[in-house]
Amino acid sequence: MFNKLAPLPITEPKYRRLMIFAMLWMFIGAWVDASAHRYIIDELESFFTPWHGILYSGFGVVVLSALYVKNKMRDFKFDVGILGACIFAVGGGSDAIWHSILGIEVGIEPLITPSHLMLFLGAFLMLDHVFASRPNKEILDTASLFALASSYALIVYITQFVNPFFEPYMFFQNNEFIYQAFSASSVFFQAMLSSVVFVYAIRFNVLPKNMALIYLISVSYTHLTLPTICSV
């Protein structure tokens, strides 16, 4: 099944650069939207917001650029990228209905609502398309590095409620054992997640500067949404 969904290699550098541009547009929009959920959610109760405009216009650019590249390559295969785009589109429509009926999510709600879970899944699959379509399966090019970093940033965002590094005071201020145990376990949990990402990257003989680039990109993304790590 997974082999059937595997994308064809995209070898043209200009097409890979186009994928980076589209990916950055969409995910910057995603982090701006996430910041809005965190900081100014009380001011607007509509789905039609500037940050949703950035996010979904970025999604449109991703889809159009992917279709353009596939057409140029005469690639009419249904792959993981198309599957991810379909899931993301359904999630976006569901999110619009959700917002219209139930309002805007607050607190932990944006991480666990069905519509947002569909958006997360669709985004992961589209990132996997960028990663899996790299020209050389043995090394990571710039586009695949961006895809891996964006995937890690998305993982960090989704698991922020069990991440003590963004709100250390909130995690460690209580002296009760249950809070201390949860805080300690969350440290190990985040270490495990980051280890999976970076150990996987090591198998491609990634240079140290590129490992640093993966971390820098992911941190830059998440600090748009969760800058409290810098202020504590």
Residue locations for each model-derived region?
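N-terminal signal-anchor module of multipass membrane proteins
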Residues: 2-59
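Membrane-interface helix-loop-helix junctions at boundaries between adjacent transmembrane segments
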Residues: 76-80, 97-147, 167
